[in-house]
Every structure is written in C-alpha cells, then in structure tokens.
C-alpha cells in the first residue's frame, strides 16, 4: 500500500494511510490473526456475524416498508 507525502505533511499522509487500511479491512484482519482461533470458535463467530447481518437486513426492510419508525438522523453543525 502506498501513500504520497505532500509538502512534508506526514500527519496527513498517515491519516490517508489509516483510511485506506480501514477500507481494505486490514485492521480487522490483524485483530483476527493476532491469536489462534479454534475452528469451533471460528464457526461460532461466523454464525453470529451472519445472524447479525440477517437481523440488520430485516430491520432495514421493515423500516423501508414503514412497519418500524425510521432512525432519527443526527443533527450536525448546530450549536
């Protein structure tokens, strides 16, 4: 992965690198590979993730159909 440093602005380059790594899922991968995960634990984690995704999808569908109230959007920039 490569990030350009412009005008010796290393902070901005680091921020861009972190953003790229986050998008690629590198941090999550590092966290998962940080220690050995037993196959049974891996199956349980993946099953829980699938259930979470299905619930989220169902919730969004219910909101679109008007059966659940929409989540209020946060107000940005009001002081």
From Swiss-Prot:
The UniProt entry, under Pfam families, shows:
Ribosomal_S21
The ranges of region (Disordered) come to 59-79
The protein's UniProt keywords, in alphabetical order, are: Ribonucleoprotein, Ribosomal protein
Gene3D superfamilies reported for this sequence: Ribosomal protein S8
Biological process GO terms, please?
translation
Q: Which GO terms describe its molecular function?
A: structural constituent of ribosome
Extract one GO cellular component term from the record.
Answer: ribonucleoprotein complex
Q: Hey, which family's this protein in?
A: Belongs to the bacterial ribosomal protein bS21 family.
Quote the protein name from its UniProt record. Small ribosomal subunit protein bS21
**Source species:** Methylocella silvestris (strain DSM 15510 / CIP 108128 / LMG 27833 / NCIMB 13906 / BL2)
- Gene name of this polypeptide: rpsU
């Amino acid at each position: 992965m490569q990030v350009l440093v412009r005008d010796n602005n290393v902070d901005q380059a680091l921020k861009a690198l972190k953003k790229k790594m986050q998008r690629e899922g590198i941090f999550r991968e590092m966290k998962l590979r940080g220690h050995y995960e037993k196959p049974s634990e891996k199956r349980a984690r993946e099953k829980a993730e699938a259930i979470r995704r299905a619930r989220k999808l169902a919730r969004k569908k219910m909101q679109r159909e008007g059966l659940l109230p929409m989540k209020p959007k946060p107000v940005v920039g009001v002081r």
